[in-house]
C-alpha cells in the first residue's frame, strides 16, 4: 500500500545543506499499522510528510496504492491526496465551525450534496464517539475530543491510508490510550493502512504490526513488532524497548550502591534482560544450581508485544567471583542481556 524507495531529502540552508532523510526505503502492506520511532530531530516528521508529498523528496520514489506520487502533475497529486488522510499533534480545527462543520469541510470542498454530507458525517461522528458533540465548538472540547474530530475529518474522503504525525504526544496517558484504541478499531473495521510516527515505544507496542527505527535520517532497523522486541539489533531499539518498563531498585539498595566492590562481601546487583524464548526458560534457576550462586530477586517485570514476551529481572547475586562470572557468561550465551548496575556492601 505504501512503498518508499531510496528516499533522500536535503534542505538547503544559508550556510550548509542538511540531510534530513538518507536513502530511506520502507514497504507497508495493505491493512497494516506501521510505526516509525525515533528521537526528536531523527527525521520522522519529514518522512511522513514525504508520503503525501507535503515535503517533496530530493530523490527517490513514493508509491501509494500502486500510484507513483512523485511522477504526478500538481492536479493529479491533489486528486491522489484524497486517498491519504492525515492527523497531527496539533488538531488544526477551525474555531468558528462546529464539530459537524469541521468534519464536513473536506466534503464541502469536493462539492458533495448536503444529503451525502449529512449521512457521511453522522456516521463518522458515531464512529469516533462524538455524536453528542456535533453542535459543539472546539473551544468546548477536551484535547482527546479535538483529536477525535481531526480523525473523523481525515476519514471524510474515505482514504485508504491514514498518516498520524505524533497524534498522541500532546495528550495525557488516559486520553492517549483511548485514541490508540480508536485507531486500532478504525484499522480493523475500515481496513485502512496506518502509518504513525512517535517517540514512544509504548505506542508502537500497543497498536502496531510493523516498526521502523529511524536515527539521523536513516532507517537503522525494521521488522514486525514481535521481531524487534524479541531480538533488537541496535542499541537505539534496545533503549526504546527499555523505556516501556518502569522498574527501579528499592531505596535502601540505591542508597548503598557503589560502582566498584568495597570489600569481598560486596555482591553485584545485576539486571537481566529477557526476550523471546529466554523469558520462559528457567535460566536463572538453572544458573543458580549449575554454578552455586544465590540470586535474590529485587524486582521483575514481564510484558508482551507482537505476541512476544520480554522483560527484566534485577537481582542481587551472591557467590564467589568465578561463579558469578560463569553465571553471567552462561546467561549471555542463552540470549540474556546482562548489566551490572553496581555493588552493595
UniProtKB/Swiss-Prot annotation:
Gene Ontology molecular function terms on file: ABC-type D-methionine transporter activity; ATP binding; ATP hydrolysis activity
InterPro entries in the cross-refs: AAA+_ATPase, ABC_MetN_proteobac, ABC_transporter-like_ATP-bd, ABC_transporter-like_CS, ACT-like_dom_sf, MetN_ABC, MetN_ABC_transporter-like, NIL_domain
Predominant place of localization: membrane
Keywords, alphabetical: Amino-acid transport, ATP-binding, Cell inner membrane, Cell membrane, Membrane, Nucleotide-binding, Translocase, Transport
ABC transporter domain location: 2-241
Annotated TM spans: none
Protein's UniProt keywords contain Translocase: yes
Chain coiled-coil ranges: none
Any Pfam family: ABC_tran
Compartment list: Cell inner membrane
PROSITE patterns with a match to the protein in the record: ABC_TRANSPORTER_1, ABC_TRANSPORTER_2, METN
Membrane topology of the entry: Peripheral membrane protein
EC number in record: 7.4.2.11
Residues that bind ATP: 38-45
Catalytic function, reaction form: L-methionine(out) + ATP + H2O = L-methionine(in) + ADP + phosphate + H(+); D-methionine(out) + ATP + H2O = D-methionine(in) + ADP + phosphate + H(+)
GO cellular component: Gram-negative-bacterium-type cell wall; plasma membrane
Quaternary structure (record): The complex is composed of two ATP-binding proteins (MetN), two transmembrane proteins (MetI) and a solute-binding protein (MetQ).
Family label: Belongs to the ABC transporter superfamily. Methionine importer (TC 3.A.1.24) family.
Job description of the protein: Part of the ABC transporter complex MetNIQ involved in methionine import. Responsible for energy coupling to the transport system.
Name assigned to this protein: Methionine import ATP-binding protein MetN
Higher taxonomy: Bacteria, Pseudomonadati, Pseudomonadota, Gammaproteobacteria, Pasteurellales
Gene giving rise to this polypeptide: metN
